[in-house]
């Protein structure tokens, strides 16, 4: 799981699911019922649903993986720490562990390896859609999640998971794969990536599938 937390640059539909596993919330509000049933998952299909540009340098990803991957901590906590590590190494998190919105905006313009259309999409997803979700949090799910993550603040990792879903939903036509599976997932994520409760519902379904 942790290997793909920050590798949005080459993400396909399966990697998006891995990102959404970050959203393990102890308790939450009521999700959209439609988010409790996942679309078709073809594990043998490696087609990309969206060709997302590189977001973070490989050397940063590898350094954070080496630093945290071999830890004996629970997988969810390691994933949170790896994501936070990547953002810190890129100077995108303040000393109080909150995401630095001004630096995020500059980073997108200077470092994201994509077209202007992609940079606009990333900026909107992170700054206008996902970070505000963290601020709203009517069910206090972030504070409930912290109890299972040690000293790792879940908000940065949740922001990454949320943004990945938005990238898939709004993927530019030239970078989009047209297939029944991809179309089904885009429709699903357009409904189920707008609240922490909905993201949690996706996680719970995935966890149930893993234990079968």
Curated annotation (Swiss-Prot):
Stored InterPro entries: OBP47-like_dom, Odorant-binding_protein, PBP_GOBP_sf
* Family that this chain belongs to: Belongs to the PBP/GOBP family.
**Keywords attached to this entry:** Disulfide bond, Olfaction, Secreted, Sensory transduction, Signal, Transport
Job of this protein: Present in the aqueous fluid surrounding olfactory sensory dendrites and are thought to aid in the capture and transport of hydrophobic odorants into and through this fluid.
By what name is this protein known? Answer: General odorant-binding protein 68
Cystine bridges: which residues? 64-85, 80-152, 130-162
Give a Pfam family name. OBP47_like
Q: Does the keyword Methyltransferase apply?
A: no
Annotated localization:
Secreted
A Gene Ontology molecular function term for this protein is: odorant binding
**Quick one: signal sequence residues?**
1-28
A GO BP annotation: sensory perception of smell
Annotated gene: Obp68
Top-level taxonomic group: Eukaryota
